[in-house]
């Protein structure tokens, strides 16, 4: 679809900036287009918890005034000036309710800003609102939200994934130009896959966690959800980097990710395909599209190598133990402290995870569970290090199945762990990965992911950008008139 034939809210970041710089559109027009889309469709999609309409329009008017005064120079210090975005509700936003979709934090107004949202604010981005999620990020469908369940814009009888499901749905439904989410083990890539958009899970420590309500502190990674890999690269340029407020951030330079394709080409890279990621139980539609994608890339000139890696079942066990243990520790700080209004207790999923975590950390069981899980985690990290001596990148399906019907997750206590089985290993190892659409099957999106060595964002983004230059899958968006019957 040509840029000038799109509705304003359908534009990418790069397209929006081009038109803003040419004076073809204003930030107010762009912001109103997104707000109008929210008004029209969000009563069915339910992506947003809070819409900051007045603030967004105020910021848009301010952006237009700066552009009027400074012209093209306005973007020198504010590279996202005038661009509206959505933000997952576990990022602290000063003066704006931040709930993590939990009744525990309902009414909580943070007195400070997260590093990520502060960087976006400094870059001139405009906050449209806070998006729904699984409560405290405990889930892969948004069904554990204490408020409501977000629906997949491609088919509102299906889940958008989670825990960043609200952000992914908002991007897919063109209710924002881009969004911000967080991932512990699939919470960016999973929703991106099921909603047919692009999602970047940065290396652990590449982006600051300061001001993000913690789930599992050793794997939590903030990152962008957008319409293209190029847009994700632009956002990563802004939010990545060392932060003195987060001691776990990497003290290494941030490359200009938009220039990554100048250094890398898919045709000169060796890409590994772990047989353990392909030989697992994949839904027929997913397997068909993955095989088509591999054949397409081979025809393009990509060199593939089959890899023999650790079975994914180990990652499921390790992640389940470590995540529950860290949840138990992190949520203990909230119990009994009045953050907001009178509220209900923790939801069922949060209680389940805290109890299991308390068990694995308790005397007599620590060595049997938590300590052993940490040892196996080291083996997983070493397994990836060995693989990356043989290949430059790893390619795999992002999700093993198509977006399931709302309600399916309630039938399995390990729904999220099984859905995220292809993402958990790289999350445990702290590796970067980008999920990109590779087609649709029976009207639902299918996605692949490029996984790279730690701190190789430039490499995975280069692969994703080139992939999207040679196909059009990322240009497909849901027909909301049909799916929502508006």
Please name every model-derived segment.
Residues 34, 56, 88, 120, ...:
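Conserved hydrophobic/aromatic pocket- or pore-lining residues that grip, position, or stack substrates
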Residues 80-222, 276, 325, 396-414:
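Short glycine/serine-rich loop/turn segments
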Residues 3, 65-77, 257-268, 484:
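Short, basic, low-complexity termini and linkers enriched in Ser/Thr/Gly/Pro
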Residues 40, 122, 173-179, 184-280, ...:
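Structural helix-boundary/capping segments
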Residues 15-18, 35, 265-266, 277-279, ...:
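Serine-dependent amide/ester hydrolase catalytic core
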